[in-house]
């Protein structure tokens, strides 16, 4: 099972998804990340 949490440390506009995805994996050591409709970075993790 996975769940999404808003990234607490991602800076800047969340376009494109790649920036957010990289941030979640490299900086927060989570599975992945994506930009949602609110233009914020949401990280996916196991929960």
Swiss-Prot record:
Q: Disulfide connectivity? A: 3-47, 14-35, 20-41, 24-43
Q: In which tissues is it expressed?
A: Epidermis and vascular bundles of pods, stems, roots, leaves and wet or dry seeds.
Arranged from A to Z, the UniProt key words for this protein are: Antimicrobial, Disulfide bond, Fungicide, Plant defense
Spell out the SUPFAM superfamilies in the cross-references.
Scorpion toxin-like
Q: Which example biological process does GO assign this protein?
A: killing of cells of another organism
Question: Does rRNA processing appear among the keywords?
Answer: no
Coiled coil region boundaries? none
Show the Pfam families listed in the entry.
Answer: Gamma-thionin (PF00304)
Q: Which InterPro entries match?
A: Defensin_plant, Scorpion_toxin-like, Scorpion_toxin-like_sf
Q: Does the keyword ATP-binding apply?
A: no
Q: What does this protein do?
A: Possesses antifungal activity sensitive to inorganic cations.
What is the similarity comment for this entry? Belongs to the DEFL family.
Protein name per UniProt: Defensin-2
Q: Which organism is it from?
A: Pisum sativum
């Amino acid at each position: 099972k996975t769940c999404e949490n808003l990234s607490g440390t991602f800076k800047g506009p969340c376009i494109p998804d790649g920036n957010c995805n990289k941030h979640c994996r490299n900086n927060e050591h989570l599975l992945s990340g994506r930009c949602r409709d609110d233009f914020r970075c949401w990280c996916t993790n196991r929960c």
